Amino acid sequence: GIPCAESCVWIPCTVTALLGCSCKDKVCYLD
């Protein structure tokens, strides 16, 4: 539920994905 300051509209979460973030509603979120 916490925004990870990365978008995933065109490409998946990259840097923030390593921190555990996942794509939700076109934005990378962490819980």
From Swiss-Prot:
Cross-link Cyclopeptide (Gly-Asp): where in chain: G1-D31
Coiled coil regions, renumbered to chain: none
GO biological process: defense response
Keywords: Disulfide bond, Knottin, Plant defense
SUPFAM superfamilies for the chain: Cyclotides (SSF57038)
Modification note: Contains 3 disulfide bonds. This is a cyclic peptide.
Domain of life: Eukaryota
InterPro entries named in the record: Cyclotide, Cyclotide_bracelet_CS, Cyclotide_sf
Pfam families: Cyclotide (PF03784)
Disulphide connectivity of cysteines: C4-C21, C8-C23, C13-C28
Family as reported in the entry's similarity comment: Belongs to the cyclotide family. Bracelet subfamily.
Function statement: Probably participates in a plant defense mechanism.
Domain characteristics, as noted in the entry: The presence of a 'disulfide through disulfide knot' structurally defines this protein as a knottin.
Protein name: Cyclotide cter-E
Species: Clitoria ternatea
